[in-house]
Amino acid sequence: MLDASGCSWAMWTWALLQLLLLVGPGGCLNRQELFPFGPGQGDLELEAGDDVVSPSLELIGELSFYDRTDITSVYVTTNGIIAMSEPPATEYHPGTFPPSFGSVAPFLADLDTTDGLGNVYYREDLSPFIIQMAAEYVQRGFPEVSFQPTSVVVVTWESVAPYGGPSSSPAEEGKRNTFQAVLASSNSSSYAIFLYPEDGLQFFTTFSKKDESQVPAVVGFSKGLVGFLWKSNGAYNIFANDRESIENLAKSSNAGHQGVWVFEIGSPATAKGVVSADVNLDLDDDGADYEDEDYDLVTSHLGLEDVATPSPSHSPRRGYPDPHNVPRILSPGYEATERPRGVPTERTRSFQLPAERFPQHHPQVIDVDEVEETGVVFSYNTGSQQTCANNRHQCSVHAECRDYATGFCCRCVANYTGNGRQCVAEGSPQRVNGKVKGRIFVGSSQVPVVFENTDLHSYVVMNHGRSYTAISTIPETVGYSLLPLAPIGGIIGWMFAVEQDGFKNGFSITGGEFTRQAEVTFLGHPGKLVLKQQFSGIDEHGHLTISTELEGRVPQIPYGASVHIEPYTELYHYSSSVITSSSTREYTVMEPDQDGAAPSHTHIYQWRQTITFQECAHDDARPALPSTQQLSVDSVFVLYNKEERILRYALSNSIGPVRDGSPDALQNPCYIGTHGCDSNAACRPGPGTQFTCECSIGFRGDGQTCYDIDECSEQPSRCGNHAVCNNLPGTFRCECVEGYHFSDRGTCVAAEDQRPINYCETGLHNCDIPQRAQCIYMGGSSYTCSCLPGFSGDGRACRDVDECQHSRCHPDAFCYNTPGSFTCQCKPGYQGDGFRCMPGEVSKTRCQLEREHILGAAGGADAQRPTLQGMFVPQCDEYGHYVPTQCHHSTGYCWCVDRDGRELEGSRTPPGMRPPCLSTVAPPIHQGPVVPTAVIPLPPGTHLLFAQTGKIERLPLERNTMKKTEAKAFLHIPAKVIIGLAFDCVDKVVYWTDISEPSIGRASLHGGEPTTIIRQDLGSPEGIALDHLGRTIFWTDSQLDRIEVAKMDGTQRRVLFDTGLVNPRGIVTDPVRGNLYWTDWNRDNPKIETSHMDGTNRRILAQDNLGLPNGLTFDAFSSQLCWVDAGTHRAECLNPAQPGRRKVLEGLQYPFAVTSYGKNLYYTDWKTNSVIAMDLAISKEMDTFHPHKQTRLYGITIALSQCPQGHNYCSVNNGGCTHLCLPTPGSRTCRCPDNTLGVDCIERK
């Protein structure tokens, strides 16, 4: 290695410098040999600071870059980048490569000129001297090329300092870097010249604000994001990215002169990658030519590797690996593509620093376009030998790490399956979650059907090899036409196919971390469909994650048709890190009945797919994987539900040897999935057709029936001090209590010195601006970014969705796009809401007509006209609907009305009092964007959940304090009016009532789509409660005047009470004691009642001194029943087992719903539109939370981090009941649903 300190070359004048460049190589590059720079040369100077980006430098000439030839402006940054477009303000570049924009990076690092000692200069220069100087540098690097530039961009970083960060050391102080980048362009090509003078690089790493650690600089080029509908990284090239290679920049060269590096960056030859110069650094004075031995010495000395693909007649240079037989990498997630085979030329040869010097980065020449085209990905061993000593964390917690001669490998322990990096319990059901987006042309249509952010959920019964996949919110225009594409979910079946002896399914091979690209050709139909799927392993919830993209054209299948696919087999061909398969299959389309006949047609389509993954090649002793395996799909079921817009695929899969026909009936049942083991058990094959069933880890039983082991109950102290144990199916989870965090030893320690950081609160996150995205705090120091409704992206970069491009409005309406929203307005001469427009003037509503009739104004009511004394005039809202509360201004009486203006019985109140009326008309949503209804998962801890029209928001609690700055939306369904809320602490699911549809729905706190469980035979469902022990829900219906019960999935409904009720609203349960409580705010006879949960022993608890009792809550710890009254403006409590009531607080404004937690009551108030905390012990309001959007608040409940202790007679085995098990004090009652037709149901006590 040359020593820079040993350079003793004399200084030369500029003229002699040019002569030396032409005659032969020089020594180390002196600063005087840089291109002239500074204000005297006409340079612009970048503003001093950190992370500064220059204004656009408009170019006179055009710059070529990769396959682009239209770049007319560039941007210069403090951090050693020349950008082809303006860098996003939210993107942090140092320590990450490639960035999202086109970039030339002579020294990408976190650089700082805040102190004013360093400077960044830049200009475009057309002077003959500079143009000739650039031409000579290029000529040195590419002697076979005749290049005469017409424009030169010169950028100089002079004496720039590193951003030190909090970990800066005194040894780094005073160190400065000077380097230069020159972009020379002609009409046909562009070149980059990087110049690193002697002693110009004094530091090689900088502090990363993102990773909070020292990271090496990067030298490279990036095309940036490419693609129209779906963005992905384009081609990029890295030439240095560790300390040793960065140090070599001033000592080495690819253009024959130390410190000089030349690259061809824009020409027909660079469409797939930047081309490095290939001129040896001459180490001898006589300038003699060298043989290959010397070439090997020099390139090895410089840290360069020839990665060009040799032709059969051209062997790789000695000392370098054949690119078609490269070692495999162990570090996950980094890929390099095979270069296209063909005869190499000097123009296509690429150089890169040796792979073993880059343990944390991608191999250097990456061609994403070729990955997408061929799907072939090879893994490179990018690091020196790695051992388990410092890489154990790369293995699953259920795996062991083993060292081998060339590296380490992970292997799952007994009773677990996977590839070692990812392991799951054998026989345990698996869940797969992900997103799907598509751009699909149906039939001959020229307009694509576009959908984004669509949920995919899959459930896998592993020991039977059955996979059930559902894709939600698929438009009907494309839903039926996607029915033949069962392999969208079939890849999940391959992952968990039943394994025959000696054969491996996809998860055993890949661990659920791979990329799949498939191409579907429909014979006899033009066009094709491309399917891309990325599996990203197991997330923190134990679920596999997948992203799916669909693009292309499919044949049209008639609405209402069904598709039948016969069982089939598919051969999978295996080689290192690559799996391929192709097949030709049939599917039959059966059209809907027409005149008693159902026409059917059989079609043929071809599938070709490539799966790329990373494997561990260090374990030579492991059994070799068969080169070909056969996937047998024994049953295929496909369905499109147009009402729910859900696409479903179900397949049964096994993997084994190549054979003809269906699986042998004499095979072991474990291999073909015909055993009778529990879904939480593993099937163990024995001799012949014998087998045994063994419950999976975390379950107990005989294998035929397995029960979850409650590890938390069996060993309550297993999580240690300051921790809470949460039981989960098959496992458990320990969570540190507030104020503690896990130490390296897995115990909870006080977080005094390492408090978690809420980056959302501090603003130190990388989410897009608040106008486009929200930062969602997930607990600890973690957060996630989510684009706001009306924007799309990953949350870090969100772009406005132009809804008007998708023809959202009626053809006779104007569409106005706005950031995050859009508006539809009927054209003149048409009436409607913009989504439906009809000729004519806008018709008046019933309320408007009645109001005008009473006022005697046929042409419209005069707002200034006085109302006749004693006359009732209805009040209409801004949309023409009846205001839910109507009042007679002469008498002072008020009452509730339905949507048709009819008075609701029992709602009339005397002067000075207004009844708590609910609007059954959902607010219009056409003024905003289509809001996705996906649930935003809740972080750990206890939360208040409250409803605000169609939105449910969460408000974290720390002990009894509301953490108001962390309030976020949990769920938003714009078309609904959510009234009541209840929380199931067992499954972590929130239930609600909706009076606009009307319906009852639910959603999991872990995320996913909300579902409706009841939508039939409802009037105005309001209050809702549940029995988390007996697994039932209860609700009140103020229109049908009844109280009902059902199972938690909405089945087995039974009416408990339908008499003696006028306006039932609040309802709560005491599952441990078997009691039910509810309010009835009938103005003539308001009351609070109770009964056993089976409907027996009904009685009145409170009747006197009540006004409008709304909300109701029961505290299981203190056995107190509390309520809020909007008529008396009080909060009161009582113990149902004891006489007497206690006034907690008077002077409440207009309380609606209430819940309790610890010593506090929390209630929603209609007048202040707020959530108020009230201390029961001192009878005082302690805090108030005002949501960002000031609209009416409805139900409120508490989402507990764990269930309260207790049980009832329905807790175990449904109390021995065949259907509804309803607890009573000290017992239970078995009840049948109201509709028992054809149901074998037994009622008993």
UniProtKB/Swiss-Prot annotation:
Site feature Involved in perlecan binding, where: H457, Y459, R648
Post-translational modification: N- and O-glycosylated.
Domain EGF-like: 384-424, 666-707, 708-749, 756-799, 800-838, 1206-1242
Region (Disordered) location: 307-344
One MF annotation (Gene Ontology) recorded for this entry: collagen binding
Residues glycosylated per entry: N187, T299, S331, T337, T345, T348, N415, T920, T933
Disulfide bridge map: C388-C401, C395-C410, C409-C616, C412-C423, C670-C683, C677-C693, C695-C706, C712-C725, C719-C734, C736-C748, C760-C775, C767-C785, C787-C798, C804-C815, C809-C824, C826-C837, C847-C876, C887-C894, C896-C917, C1210-C1221, C1217-C1230, C1232-C1241
Motif (Cell attachment site) on chain: 700-702
A GO CC annotation given for this chain: basement membrane
One BP term from GO: glomerular basement membrane development
Pfam families named among the record's database cross-references: cEGF, EGF_3, EGF_CA, FXa_inhibition, G2F, Ldl_recept_b, NIDO, Thyroglobulin_1
Location, primary (coarse class): secreted
Domain annotation Thyroglobulin type-1: ranges: 844-917
SUPFAM superfamilies in the record: EGF/Laminin, GFP-like, Growth factor receptor domain, Thyroglobulin type-1 domain, YWTD domain
Residues forming coiled coils: none
Localization, UniProt: Secreted, Extracellular space, Extracellular matrix, Basement membrane
Physiological role: Sulfated glycoprotein widely distributed in basement membranes and tightly associated with laminin. Also binds to collagen IV and perlecan. It probably has a role in cell-extracellular matrix interactions.
Assembly and binders: Interacts with FBLN1. Interacts with LGALS3BP. Interacts with PLXDC1. Interacts with SVEP1.
Listed name of the protein: Nidogen-1
